[in-house]
Amino acid sequence: MFRRNFLFGKDGGTANLIDVGSEDLYQPGKGYGFVTEKNRREQKLLQIRELNSSFDTMYWYQNEQLSFLKEDENGCYLDSAEEVAALERQSGEPMSGSPRRIPLIFKVDVPRQGNYRITLTIRSEEEMGEILIFTGRRRLAFHGTVGAGEFTYTMITNVCDIVPVGYSRIFADKTVDIAVLADRPRISALTVEEVNGPTVYLAGDSTVTDQPGDYPYYPGTCYCGWGQMLPAYFDTRVAVSNHSHSGLTTDSFRKEGHYAVISQYSKPGDYVFFQFGHNDQKLPGLQAKGGYRANLQRYIKENQAKGVYPVLVTPIARNTWRLRDQTYLDLLEEFADVCLELGAQYGIPVLDLHAHSKKYVLEKGLQDAKPIFFPGDYTHTNDFGAYKMAGYVAQEIREKCKGHSERAYAYLAECVTDGFGAWEPVGQ
C-alpha cells in the first residue's frame, strides 16, 4: 500500500525519506510541495477550493504574496505573526479578531481515493503556543497548545472525488492536503500512508459543508459547517468524507450528482449521515411530511440494501426570534420530528442536533448566541460554532449508537473522542 515519508529543512540526506526545502512548491507531476499564493495563482486546479486545503487569501490580498517560506535544521516554516504585523503596519490599523494567522500548506499526490493516515512531526526550540492542524478541505484534525521540543500527532483523512461549487460535473481528487496554523507554523517530518477502515460520508447543506477559510485567518470570521469539525471528535479508526454543499435539499443532493459520488465510493460497513431541511422548507414539494420524508426514506432503503449504515441528523436550529415579543421562532421543528419518526420506523440512529442547538440558543438568547455564528448571520456557524455543533453530534453518536443492536453503529460510538476541549470566542 502507498506510503511516503518526508523530511523538511536542512537535515536532508536520510535514506527512504524525501527531502523537502522551502523552495519546493507543489507542481503537477512532482507529487508533493507547499501551496502558496504564487503557485495557486499559476495553477487553475489549485484555485478550486474543494480540491485543495480550502484556504485562500482575503480577496483584497489576492495579488499579494503572504506566505514567505523559510527553513532551518528543524524543518520548514513561515513567520505568520510577523507577516500579519507587516500587513497591519501597511494598512495602519490592526485586523479585527486576534490573533490572525497565515497557514503553512503542504500537498501530497496519492494513487487513489480512500483513507490515509498522516503522521506530522514538529520540532521547535521555542514554545509553539496554540496550533491548529487541518486536513483535506479544511477539516479540523488538531487544536491545542504545543511547547518547545518535539511534537508528533497522527490523524486520518479521506480523499474522495467531489462536485465543486460552481461546477456541474464530478472532479477526481487524489491529493492529501495539510494546513498548519500557528504564530510560526512549522513542519519537520511527515508520513502519509494508505489505510483501510470505515468512512463516515456526510450529505447535507451549508450548515454541514466544508466551508472555505480566508486568511489571515481568524476562526470567528470564517463560515464553517459542523461536518468539517466532526473529525476532531473521531479517533484514527474512522475517516470523514463531506459531500454537503450550500443550498442543497434532499432532492438536489441527488439530482446534482453529489449522491452519485457517495454511491460510488461507499462500501459495506461505511456510514452516511443525512442532515437536510433548511432549504427543503423553502420548496412546496419538499415539505416535512411530503417530499422531504419520501426522499429520506429512499436514501435509508438504498444504503441499507448495500450494507451501508444510514444515520439521520436533525437540522441545526437557527438563532431566530420574534420581534414582537422576543420569543424563539423554531422554523425547523417539523423537519426534526420527521427524522425522529423515520429513525424509529427503520431502527436507525437519529442524532438530535436540532434539540442541542436549540437549547444552546434558548439558554444564551439572541445576542449572546451570536458569537458562534458568522457575523450578521443567524443560520451559519463560524469555526467556533461548528466545533460546538460537531461536539453535540459526537455526543449524540455516543448516546444513540452505543449498545445498538447493529454492531456497526456500536463500533462508531467507540470511535468517538472528547475532541480538544473548549474552543470558544473571546469573552464566552
List each language-model region with its residue ranges.
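Compositionally biased, intrinsically disordered or flexible polar/acidic segments
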Residues: 1-213, 222-224
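Glycine-rich, histidine-containing beta strand-loop boundary motifs that form or position
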Residues: 135, 204, 244, 276, ...
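Residue-level detector of flexible, active-site-proximal loop/helix-junction positions
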Residues: 146-147, 207, 247, 317, ...
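Conserved beta-strand scaffold positions in the cores of enzyme catalytic domains, especially
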Residues: 5, 240-242, 347-350
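Conserved, compact domain cores that house catalytic/ligand-binding motifs in diverse enzymes
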Residues: 33-41, 46, 194-256, 265-272, ...
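Short, structured coil segments at secondary-structure junctions
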Residues: 135-136, 234-236, 306, 346
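Alpha-helical cap/lid subdomain in secreted, periplasmic
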Residues: 257-387, 391-411, 415-418, 422-427
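N-terminal post-signal-peptidase region of extra-cytosolic proteins
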Residues: 101-104, 251, 255-259
